[in-house]
Amino acid sequence: MNRAPLKRSRILRMALTGVSAVSEESESGNKPFLLRALQIALVVSLYWVTSISMVFLNKYLLDSPSLQLDTPIFVTFYQCLVTSLLCKGLSTLATCCPGMVDFPTLNLDLKVARSVLPLSVVFIGMITFNNLCLKYVGVPFYNVGRSLTTVFNVLLSYLLLKQTTSFYALLTCGVIIGGFWLGIDQEGAEGTLSLTGTIFGVLASLCVSLNAIYTKKVLPAVDHSIWRLTFYNNVNACVLFLPLMIVLGELRALLAFTHLSSAHFWLMMTLGGLFGFAIGYVTGLQIKFTSPLTHNVSGTAKACAQTVLAVLYYEEIKSFLWWTSNLMVLGGSSAYTWVRGWEMQKTQEDPSSKDGEKSAIRV
C-alpha cells in the first residue's frame, strides 16, 4: 500500500539528482544526526519561504489596487513561459557543462507533447483556477477555499481507480468538509465572501486531484522524468493560453495597461515565474530529505503559518468561528495524512491485514 508514495519519491529523487534511492539512503545513514537535522530544517524552511512568497506575490499581481491589472490568464501564461525557458536553459547548460548542472536533456518532441496534452489540459485548469481563486478571495481564506483537494482525492480514487478508503480516513474528510462550510458561513457573515472565488477554489482542488492521478499515467511518455513532464506541461500551456487570451480580450487589456513599460512590473512578473519554477524543485527536495508523508504534514503546517501571516499583514480581525473553520480544515488534513501513513505502515508490517480491511466501512 506504501509502494506508490515510495515510487514517486524515488522518481523525484532521481529527477533532481540522478542518484539512486539506495545510494542516497546509505549516504544519509552515514551523515551525523546534527548535519541531517540541519539539512532537513533548511529544506523545509526553503519550501515554506518559497511557497508563502509565491502566494503573496501572485495576490499582488492578480489583485493589487496599485497595478489594476485584470489579466489573470496572461499572468499565468507568463509564469508558464518563464518555467519553460528555465527548463530549456538548464538543459542546455547541463549539456554544455555536465559537471556543473545535473539536468535531463530537453528536446521538444511533438509526439511526446501530444501524449502529454490531456494532462496539460488538467494542468492548465489547475494553475488557472488556482490563480483565479486567489484573485477573488483574500489570502487568509485562500487555504479554506482550496481545502477540498483531499476530499476529491478520495472521491476520484474510488470513481476512477476503484480504490476504497477506510472509515477513519472518511471521518477526517468529513472534518475538512465541515471546516470548509463553516469557513464559507463565516466569510459570508463578515461580508467578505466571494462566491466566484470559492467556486474557482473548488475547481482548483478538483484539478489538483486529477493532476495527481493522470501524472502517473503520463510519466512513462517522458521517461519518468519530472523535469521533462514540467517542460512539456508548460510548453503546452503556453500554446493553449494564447487563444484564451485573445478570446477573453486580455491582449487588448494588456496593451491599455498603464504599467506595461514599467521595469518593476516585469521584475515582479518574472519573479512570480521563478517562484513557480522553484516550488516544484523545493517540493522535490523536501520529499527527498524527508518523506512524502512528512511533506504533507509540512504543507499543512505551512498553510497554518500562511493564514496567520496573511491576517497580520492585511490587518484583519477574524471571529472565533472563522479560526475554528481553519483549524478544522488543517486538523482534518493532518489527521488524514496521519491515518493514511498509519494504514500504510500497518499494511507493510502485516500484509494479511489487507484482507481484513475489506470488512471495514468503505466509501
From Swiss-Prot:
Its main location: Golgi. It is found in: Golgi apparatus membrane. The keyword Ribosomal protein does not apply. It is a multi-pass membrane protein. The gene is Slc35c1. The chain crosses the membrane at residues 33-55, 75-97, 110-129, 139-161, 166-184, 194-213, 226-248, 263-285. GO terms for molecular function: GDP-fucose transmembrane transporter activity. The lineage of its organism: Eukaryota, Metazoa, Chordata, Craniata, Vertebrata. Keywords: Golgi apparatus, Membrane, Sugar transport, Transmembrane, Transmembrane helix, Transport. It comes from Mus musculus (Mouse). This is GDP-fucose transporter 1. It comes from the Eukaryota. The keyword Nucleotidyltransferase does not apply. Antiporter specific for GDP-l-fucose and depending on the concomitant reverse transport of GMP. Involved in GDP-fucose import from the cytoplasm into the Golgi lumen. One of its GO terms (cellular component) is Golgi membrane. GO terms for biological process: 'de novo' GDP-L-fucose biosynthetic process; GDP-fucose import into Golgi lumen; GDP-L-fucose salvage; lipid glycosylation; negative regulation of Notch signaling pathway. Belongs to the TPT transporter family. SLC35C subfamily. PANTHER family: SOLUTE CARRIER FAMILY 35 (PTHR11132). It catalyses: GMP(out) + GDP-beta-L-fucose(in) = GMP(in) + GDP-beta-L-fucose(out).
